[in-house]
Regions:
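A hydrophobic C-terminal alpha-helical subdomain
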Residues: 219-278
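Conserved N-proximal alpha/beta basic substrate-recognition cap immediately N-terminal to
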Residues: 81
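Oxidoreductase cofactor-interface core, primarily capturing Rossmann-like NAD(P)-dependent enzymes
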Residues: 2-37, 49-55, 59-61, 68-78, ...
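Active-site regions of enzymes building and remodeling cell-envelope glycoconjugates
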Residues: 39-47
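Short, basic/glycine-rich phosphate-binding loops at helix/coil junctions
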Residues: 63-66, 252
């Protein structure tokens, strides 16, 4: 009996490991580093590139949490196919996949993985956040809040978003591992959704000062994140925000939300800032 967590030392996987361990769940942390130590978990070196390694990790697991890393789309598609192949062979009891905000209704790696899980015959759920609050911790964003009392982000002023945090994802993963009756897509995020000025207002209320929203272009976003994640992934991120600019909103649908399906309400922006110690 164990729960297998991909990216266990990363931004999204680490909170899942911590949440499951705190709940007394036996955790197997998958990492690329065979010498990595993950508190509260047994560590196994296994990457998305080896189907055999994934099969070995998934076999007899009570639950598997997967999400695709921020690499090239070509690599993401390869990883998606490998995950599906391993799930079909190993037959874990339940799989939870976080799209990390990527759409699943059009082509791409996230869509391919969601479709593959749906056709695998294995119990599964797909967590669908929109945008992560952790994006706002990028130096370009949070430093501007601190130094200029402005919150820069590549969305329109009137564009509402159902923000979610990695901590919220971890809470939902824990619940879904105990609720195999909840399958299909589970949307995770604040509802009602917040516009840019409302988000800036939440930052201002937390820090005790007036913070204004500052819309920037996807190209400005690309330039700001490239030193952190690399030019290729940064270009992909900019493309996502460019495509997003044509949409009316990124609000979750309340009918398939974690609030309705699991009784879990995501943190407010202020609660999240407090929980991460800012």
């Amino acid at each position: 009996m164990t729960y297998v967590i991909h990216g266990a030392t990363g931004a999204q996987g680490a909170p899942v490991v911590a949440t499951l361990a705190a709940a007394g769940k036996p955790v197997t942390a998958l990492t690329r580093d065979p010498n990595a130590a993950v508190e509260g978990a047994r560590t196994v070196a296994a990457g998305y590139g080896s189907i055999d390694a994934l099969i070995e990790a998934y076999r007899d697991a009570d639950g598997v949490f997967v999400h695709l890393p921020m690499v090239s789309e070509e690599d993401r598609q390869t990883y998606a196919r490998n995950i599906v192949a391993a799930v079909r062979e190993a037959r874990p009891a339940h799989v939870v996949f976080s799209t990390s905000g990527a759409p699943t209704d059009i082509g791409g790696a996230a869509a391919e993985l969601a479709s593959g899980l749906a056709n695998s015959g294995v119990s599964h759920a797909v967590i669908a956040p929109t945008l992560y609050l952790e994006n706002l911790l990028m130096p370009y964003v949070i430093d501007t809040v601190r130094e200029r009392d402005a919150l820069p982000y590549p969305i329109r002023t009137d564009f509402p978003v159902s923000w979610a945090s990695h901590l919220d994802i971890a809470d939902v993963v824990l619940a879904l591992f105990d609720r195999h009756d909840v399958t299909g897509q589970v949307s995770v995020g604040q509802y009602p959704a917040l516009t840019g000025p409302e988000l800036a207002g939440a930052f201002g209320a937390h820090f005790g000062k007036d913070v204004v929203f500052e819309p920037i272009t996807p190209e400005q976003m690309r330039a700001s994140v490239a030193p952190v994640i690399g030019e290729g992934p940064a270009a992909d991120v900019a493309g996502l925000y460019q495509a997003m600019s044509t949409l009316p909103h990124r609000s979750i649908a309340p009918e398939n939300s974690a609030q309705k399906l699991l009784g879990i309400t995501p943190r407010t922006t202020g609660q999240w800032l407090s929980d991460i110690g800012l």
